[in-house]
């Protein structure tokens, strides 16, 4: 069985790298996005199983991102 596809949304590159490196070490499948608009695009294009979301994004407030995703998906979101 495949592990879940995780979308990591974090604008701070070292933090994003730490998270994705950890996921890779445990053989998780993941996508990453550095801003809110990219996150929305990745989520709608790839239908991840869960999203790890930074609330302090430069282009789109994380809460607004959650509201936008909720208009078309029940994707589980964990705020980081």
Where are the language model's segments positioned?
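Short hydrophobic/Thr-rich beta-strand motif most characteristic of the beta2 strand and flanking loop
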Residues: 27-34, 42
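Active-site beta3 strand of CheY-like receiver
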Residues: 46-52, 57
């Amino acid at each position: 069985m495949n592990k879940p596809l995780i979308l990591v949304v974090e604008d701070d590159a070292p933090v994003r790298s730490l998270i994705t490196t950890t996921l890779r070490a445990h053989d998780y499948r993941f996508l990453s996005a550095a801003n809110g608009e990219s996150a929305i695009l990745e989520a709608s294009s790839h239908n991840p199983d869960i999203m790890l979301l930074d609330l302090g994004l430069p282009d789109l407030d994380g809460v607004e991102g959650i509201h936008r995703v909720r208009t078309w998906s029940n994707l589980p979101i964990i705020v980081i």
